[in-house]
Amino acid sequence: MAKAKFERTKPHVNIGTIGHVDHGKTTLTAAISKVLYDKYPDLNEARDFATIDSAPEERQRGITINISHVEYQTEKRHYAHVDAPGHADYIKNMITGAAQMDGAILVVAATDGPMAQTREHVLLARQVGVPALLVALNKSDMVEDEELLELVEMEVRELLSSQEFDGDEAPVIRTSGLKALEGDPQWVKSVEDLMDAVDEYIPDPVRDKDKPFLMPIEDVFTITGRGTVVTGRAERGTLKINSEVEIVGIRDVQKTTVTGIEMFHKQLDEAWAGENCGLLLRGLKRDDVERGQVVVEPGSITPHTNFEANVYILSKDEGGRHNPFYSNYRPQFYFRTTDVTGVITLPEGTEMVMPGDTTEMSVELIQPIAMEEGLGFAIREGGRTVGSGRVTKITK
């Protein structure tokens, strides 16, 4: 068993705990790492509760988020687990995409049932595209009435279904993070059951390599006698030489063929997700393409100008604006590699947005961008970031 540490073949899955601030997310996170350490000591490190609870401040795109990362393994998988203890931290984390989750454990205290914050977290999880949620009915040791537990479970399932998660099939496990940390066998087993459910219910993530090819263009130049080369970092997928591609965004969609792929001045047959490469494009002139467009597998993504988004506006302390903004505010929206001006419309009933606020908004860009739901962007003003958001719905 001692060799298990060096196994690199296990699927890696990013998960997190979400839910109301006082329902025991952090205690449960600590319990998971302790229970798995006791069960598989050669796969896991011992972590104490204090290191998770004192979540370090991280700065993501200049936004301060208190968040802690814990790693642990089951026999089946390697997990990275994020716990954002504060409500505001969780919201910022989800909207800015600081931690992309492949699935999440919704922690609901059996003593309280779902609260307004629980609902908000589930809604956000759907909007940013978390694929699967399962439920830890935490503090279950404190509820002796079986009927009450069943009632809370029903309520949670209805909440999941109302946000298009699978309320009927999602595992709901009764846990007690505190009792599991204390070593109570019944509740240690509840945490083991929870992780078995996570192993089974959260699907293996589709690796970026298996998605359709997409490379944002960072630079364009001409190689005399050969043609136009675009460079950038492939975001996802793979691309073979002589493949047809589309150039999407800013202007009309153009079709072309990739006749050469180069990386660090070496010729390649194929470009992979995560690699910086240059693509030689057949029949296109230097002026036909520009930074901010994307090179994609044909038909895989379309250009759009109008969308709805969830946005976090930086506070003054984070280097954001000093004063509020209103509808018709026209900042730049930075998508992947370029800024495009857009006009903001605030939702009905929202007169203005203050620095430090989270808001929904509708945006109309002056040029189309290759867009899909879940795509992140920064809002900039005079070259500095004043907000960060995600596309929740494409409207045109």
Curated annotation (Swiss-Prot):
Monomer. The gene is tuf. Residues 62-66 are annotated as: G2. It catalyses: GTP + H2O = GDP + phosphate + H(+). Gene3D superfamilies: P-loop containing nucleotide triphosphate hydrolases, Translation factors. This is Elongation factor Tu. Disulfide bonds: none annotated. One of its GO terms (molecular function) is GTPase activity. Residues 176-178 are annotated as: G5. Keywords: Cytoplasm, Elongation factor, GTP-binding, Hydrolase, Magnesium, Metal-binding, Nucleotide-binding, Protein biosynthesis. It comes from Micrococcus luteus (strain ATCC 4698 / DSM 20030 / JCM 1464 / CCM 169 / CCUG 5858 / IAM 1056 / NBRC 3333 / NCIMB 9278 / NCTC 2665 / VKM Ac-2230) (Micrococcus lysodeikticus).
